[in-house]
Amino acid sequence: MPRRLPEVPLMIDDADRHYYEPSKGHGLPHDPFNSIVGPRPIGWVSTRGADGTVNLAPYSFFNGFNYTPPIIGFSSTSPKDSLRNVQETGEFVWNLTTRELAERMNQSCAAVPYGMNEFELAGLTPVPSRLVNVPRVAESPVNFECKVVEILQLKNHKGEATQAWLTLGEVVAVHIAKHLLKDGIFDTFGAGIILRAGGPSAYAEIGPETRFDMHRPR
C-alpha cells in the first residue's frame, strides 16, 4: 500500500491568486516569470568569433536538455556577441559559476563594445580547450567544451518569430576539478554553485543545508 502523503492546502479561490496574461502585461513592479522559473543554473558562456575575438557572458536562460549525448543550451536575444560568435564558428564553452566567482561573472555581463575582452575586464584567466578553439575560464571548477548542434529562432504560439535564439550544443569534452569528485560522484552541494533567482538582482547558492533526498517510488 502506498504511504500516506502529507496534506497540502488547496488554493482554488481566484481571490487568492494573482492572474495575468503575459501579452497584456503582468501588473507588477517586476515580471514574475523569471523568479518563478527559478532558481536557474547560469549559462556562463565563452565564445570566439571568426576574427578571433573572444567573448565571455552569462545567460539567465540555460540548462541541460539531454543525457546521451549530453546537450546543453542557452537562449540569447539578438544581437548578442555570443550568438554572433557561435553562428560563425559553431563552438562554445560553458563555465560553472560558483559563489567565489559571482562578482567576476557579474562583471562579465557589462554592456561593452564588441571586441572588448571580458576575461580581462573581469580579471579572469583564459586557458585553451582541447577539442574546441574557444578558451575556458581557468578559475571555474567545471568547463564543458561544446559543438553547436542547432541554433533556433524561437517563435510564439502564432508562429511569429521572436527576438530570442536558442543555441543547443553537444558537450564533447568535460573538465572537472578533482577535489569536487567524492567517491567518483560530483559534489554538487560542496561546489558553491550559484543560481539566478529572478528579480533584478537575486541569486541563490546551493549548500548542504538545502539538500534533501527522495527516491523514486517502486
Question: What are these model-derived regions, one by one?
Answer:
Residues 1-218:
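Basic, polyanion-binding surface patches
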